[in-house]
């Protein structure tokens, strides 16, 4: 009788196990180093290659000012010399002393001892940087970008996709609290006044117009402060935001008029048409909740508006630093303009408490790469949930923004949002005065041990109750469909008669907004 030999369990030899373990470790190491940089950005505790401190510091090097409105052709640059810094420091100390007599005076600088200074114009900023894989256009020359936005460059669908590239760039480390605070201070620096000193150089050709006496720091216009790190060859462009009485953005109100016009144009549904009592900032309103889309687009692109002005300032910075990495930042309106500029030219942009800028981005036809994943965006919006302007809740006829003449009707942001939950963490109530930049710096950015986590915005729709038509003529010449019945027996038939109304334009409206007078 045959007996089967007992089965034997096979054991791997030590050499075999060692080979498997070695291969596993090598695969893990290879996977780690092959991991895209944008997936490793969240390691805020790492101070290695993923998060590097800049070898040099950022110092204010120049200031740009650009006229808007009637003075939109004026564009100048001031080199920040030791004489300018000294005079600015004296003015800052004088202004600070005078401000101590007023309890509600907005401070010009942070009260935190870590960032204390007697002269904000002489402050040296330290920023940490990080690598970022960013999808942006291969050709970013301003002339090409402008022709692309204005529809002057024809491309096939294949060419459209081919012009986008995945670019390895250097960006500010938005997970580092100190870097976020420094960028916010750079944004607040654009609010600080500078004395009437130094030589302003014309960026454009000499003008035929006579420069108005009040132009510059005491007149209309937009400003950009340029900070430069000579060691790393990195530029930070800080754009001045809203300065207005009633709407707390800064401590002074030099450009209130044009700031309000541009705020209402950028962030309202249709030319700040909140009710019949409002004076609109453009003539694109057709009738109740109907707006001329092409008219809005033309208004935003006008050369005397802020978007064109900030693009011109960027051109000047690019000419001054052609090989440098350029980052943009700003607060409020300045933050929204920084985001629009970053979207236009593929620049890293960090905005603070900015209104929703998705709507103006679309109206300006700014480049949005097809199928862009959120982690490849280079735009970050920092804010807190007690600021109704940032959260998009400061709207309606009875809102605090409306009471001071602002139609802040947008809520949707592009890029990523980094929100501090001060309502639950600190017990704050929603208040327009929480929008102030130094309240944000002192009590929010410095009030938390870590920077807010940046996430993809939730699904959002602006102006859902408005109808936007291609043009005013399209509304007046639309085909009216009417149905009439034929009573011929034994069946009833229905036929459709199409009639076309003649093209006309409304030239007069009553107080309810209805058209009372037409012009052919």
Curated annotation (Swiss-Prot):
Q: Does the keyword Transmembrane helix apply?
A: yes
> Pfam families recorded for this chain?
Lipase_3
CDD domains assigned: Lipase_3
| Cellular location(s) | Endosome, Multivesicular body membrane; Prevacuolar compartment membrane
PROSITE patterns to which the protein is assigned, alphabetical = LIPASE_SER
Which key words tag this protein in UniProt? Autophagy, Endosome, Glycoprotein, Hydrolase, Lipid degradation, Lipid metabolism, Membrane, Signal-anchor, Transmembrane, Transmembrane helix
Residues annotated as transmembrane? 15-35
Q: Which of the residues are on side Lumenal?
A: 36-520
Give the similarity note. Answer: Belongs to the AB hydrolase superfamily. Lipase family.
| Miscellaneous notes | Present with 3060 molecules/cell in log phase SD medium.
Q: What is this protein called?
A: Putative lipase ATG15
């Amino acid at each position: 009788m045959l007996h089967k030999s007992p089965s034997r369990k096979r054991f791997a030899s030590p050499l075999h196990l060692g080979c498997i373990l070695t291969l596993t470790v090598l695969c893990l190491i290879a996977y780690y180093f092959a991991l895209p940089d944008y997936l490793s950005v969240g390691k805020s505790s790492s101070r290695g290659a993923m998060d590097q401190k800049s070898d040099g510091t950022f110092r204010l090097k120049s200031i740009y000012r650009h006229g808007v409105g009637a003075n939109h052709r004026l564009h100048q640059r001031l080199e920040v010399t030791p004489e300018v810094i000294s005079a600015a420091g004296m003015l800052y100390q004088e202004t600070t002393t005078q401000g101590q007599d007023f309890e509600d005076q907005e401070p010009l600088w942070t009260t935190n001892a870590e960032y204390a200074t007697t002269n904000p114009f002489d402050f040296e900023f330290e920023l940490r940087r990080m690598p970022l894989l960013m999808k942006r256009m291969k050709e970013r020359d301003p002339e090409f970008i402008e022709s692309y936005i204005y529809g002057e460059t024809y491309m096939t669908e294949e060419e459209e996709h081919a012009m986008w590239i995945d670019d390895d760039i250097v960006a500010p480390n938005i997970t580092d609290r100190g870097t976020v605070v420094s960028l916010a201070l750079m944004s607040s620096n654009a609010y600080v006044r500078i004395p009437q000193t130094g030589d302003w150089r014309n960026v454009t050709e000499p003008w035929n117009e006579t420069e108005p006496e009040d132009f510059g720091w005491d007149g209309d216009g937009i400003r950009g402060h340029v900070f430069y790190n000579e060691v790393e060859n990195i530029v930070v462009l800080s754009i001045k935001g809203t300065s207005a009485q009633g709407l707390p953005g800064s401590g002074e109100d030099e450009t209130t008029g044009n700031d309000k016009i541009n705020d209402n144009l950028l962030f309202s549904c249709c030319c700040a048409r909140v009710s019949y009592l409002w004076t609109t900032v453009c003539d694109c309103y057709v009738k109740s909740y109907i707006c001329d889309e092409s008219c809005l687009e033309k208004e935003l692109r006008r050369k005397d508006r802020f978007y064109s002005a900030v693009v011109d300032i960027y051109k000047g910075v690019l000419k001054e630093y052609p090989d440098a990495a350029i980052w943009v930042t700003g607060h409020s309106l300045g933050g929204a303009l920084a985001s629009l500029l970053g979207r236009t030219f593929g620049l890293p942009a960090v905005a603070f408490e900015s209104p929703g800028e998705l709507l103006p981005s679309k109206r300006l036809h700014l480049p949005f790469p097809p199928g862009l994943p959120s982690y490849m965006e280079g735009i970050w919006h920092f804010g807190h949930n007690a600021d109704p302007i940032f959260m998009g809740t400061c709207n309606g006829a009875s809102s605090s923004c409306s009471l001071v003449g602002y139609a802040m009707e947008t809520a949707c942001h592009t890029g990523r949002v980094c929100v501090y939950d001060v309502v639950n963490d600190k017990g704050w109530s929603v208040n327009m005065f929480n929008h102030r930049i130094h309240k944000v710096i002192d009590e929010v950015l410095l009030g938390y041990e870590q920077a807010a986590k940046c996430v993809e915005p939730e699904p959002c729709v602006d102006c859902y109750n408005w109808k936007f038509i291609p043009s005013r003529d399209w509304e007046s010449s639309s085909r009216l469909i009417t149905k009439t019945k034929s009573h011929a027996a034994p069946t009833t038939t229905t036929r459709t008669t199409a009639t076309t109304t003649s093209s006309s334009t409304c030239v007069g409206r009553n107080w309810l907004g209805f058209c009372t007078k037409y012009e052919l």
